[in-house]
Swiss-Prot record:
Reactions it catalyzes: (3R)-hydroxybutanoate dimer + H2O = 2 (R)-3-hydroxybutanoate + H(+)
Species assigned in the record: Burkholderia thailandensis (strain ATCC 700388 / DSM 13276 / CCUG 48851 / CIP 106301 / E264)
Family: Belongs to the D-(-)-3-hydroxybutyrate oligomer hydrolase family.
Protein name: D-(-)-3-hydroxybutyrate oligomer hydrolase
Subcellular location: Secreted
Amino acid sequence: MTTIRGGSRRASLPALALLGVLLGACHSDDNAQVNTLPGFVSGNVRKTAYDGASDDLLTAGLGKTGLGSDTRPGFANPAQPTAAELRRLAIYSNYRALVDITPNGGYGRFWGPNVDLAGNDTLGEGKIAGTEYLAYSDDGSGRKNVTLLVQVPASFDPANPCIVTATSSGSRGVYGAIAAAGEWGLKRGCAVAYNDKGGGNGAHEIGTGVVTLIDGTLASASSAGSASLFTASESSSALAAFNSAFPNRYAYKHAHSQQNPEQDWGRVTLQAVEFAYWALNEQFGPAIDGARHGVRYRPGDITTIAASVSNGGAAALAAAEQDTRGWITAVVVGEPQINVRMTPGVTVEQGGVPAPSFGRPLADYATLANLLQPCAAAAVAAVGAPYLSALPVGLTQSIRVQRCATLAAAGLVSGADTASQANDALAQLHAAGYLADSDLLQAPMWDSQAIPAIAVTYANAYTRSRVTDNLCNFSFATTNSVTGAVAPPATSPMTSLFGAGNGVPPTNGINLVFNGASGGVDHRLATPDASFAGAFCLRQLWTANQLGIGANVDAVRVAANLQRKPAIIVQGRSDALVPVNHASRAYVAQNSATEGRASQLSFYEVTNGQHFDAFLSVPGFDTRFVPVHYYDEQALNLMWNHLKSGAPLPPSQVIRTVPRGGVPGAAPALSTANLPPIVQSPGSNAITVNAGVIDVPL
């Protein structure tokens, strides 16, 4: 690894001279003759070369076989893993978190390191040699510390340069989108510009004061200083008092940084692209005075596709909207969690009928779902839903009955019995914009804790709450595996957090707990109705506009103005985490009102597609749902052909897939019969978009 000294915060010119690495000691405009590090880069740039055999950019040396193995890579010393070991685990964990990793589900046949861009099994283990550049972006405070990472494959062609962004989905660390966008970019020979959006998988163990650094290794908060990925902002005395009252708790960057990082997702994605330009100029620019490099590539010189999924997809859209220097050429995103600033007259329709609700922000629909889903899961239409919980079935059923009863007692659902109360809860979700296509996913979205985790994390972020606030009596803690009560861990989860965590508890042994009269307990077990009081409190934050939540949500809304850039959005119709009415459909409708006929946006809605392809091996998911990732990759290929050969982008359309069927847990192998192509002439499947109105065929 080579260290390239950068920002003034941690480097001095004498030290640079001593080390003989004066490659970026000063910051200046990128139009200067000398290639200079962007001013937002803070501290050192770490440059590491990978040979494509023992280690590599895509699989961390694991290859297709290792990524597909259920045995995760270990540490030589479990108490003190190396940065390389943590990187390997992070790539393994994040790759598997975003795609179906089973052979029957398509891994190794439709996608995977061995599958080339034409869909053929020609790449063996799929290891990719190249170079990584790693650094922080910061505003000088030492508190932003957005992780930036650029991967430059050995196959990069300096004469035909390209960049693909891979902003992390969810609140994942910097490798979070390696399967969603990074893999395609590397196979295409493009540099890949990653960033963690300033909320990625940074934690602070309050009891010990341990924090993570940029490479996942650990340090005390006091010794790490501004090199910490995240340190809770409270004073040491305040944290000590909190730890005394609430031991074994953790602060998380997305939830507790008090910075509402989502408002900067577009900006930091643009910074990732600019950092990639610097890295490419550093690697391929002309040599100057034997030590420095000149500028070979200036803004707009490199074909750049802003890509990713979920939160990373939203970041790509926001970046394209904010781009004033020509960094981004085109956009391809999947299932974007995007909050749209809707204007009067914009409408979402399906089959010519206006949707009952559309364009709501996540703070609204997630807190509503968190309140109602445990009850709606008992509705008639949800019978037979996939079971996605480690809790005994009987306990889960009891939670559903009790949540319905409490909702009814509070006047929030109607009905004299559980069945009617559950049906009413589901009807309320329909009225709030959730499609009937996602009825069977209401239960697993809550049972898996995806919705509770999001509701709590984003409520904290949107209210700029501190860890010591215990917002709505929720906090993050280690717990007893049997009782769910807060308990000290046998081994600190911090050791492997960078490699195995996802940034939104429950994750890596850190759970979501409700702090009741008897102390903190797993939120599902704290009360018979699964912490209804906390869920209701979260909902009230939005409905009563408490603690500044409205203003902070407004700060993350986008205008849907892509500045005439060619763009593709892909989303599954059955998405129950990010409902399509509030995300993609709303964005496309608003874009048509904003850009009109100048818009170059196409939208592909995938029937039987839902948010988490990693769930597709779960019994009941395998028989009913198809991989949206397959269409994300097809969309990237379509965009590439459009940019490089002028091929027209297929118009907006519904893609009518065919579920695999069979027996839950033993569905037949995925085949092309399940995955019809995106076509140039969709006929009756065409989605019409005009003057702010989108109409999606039934």
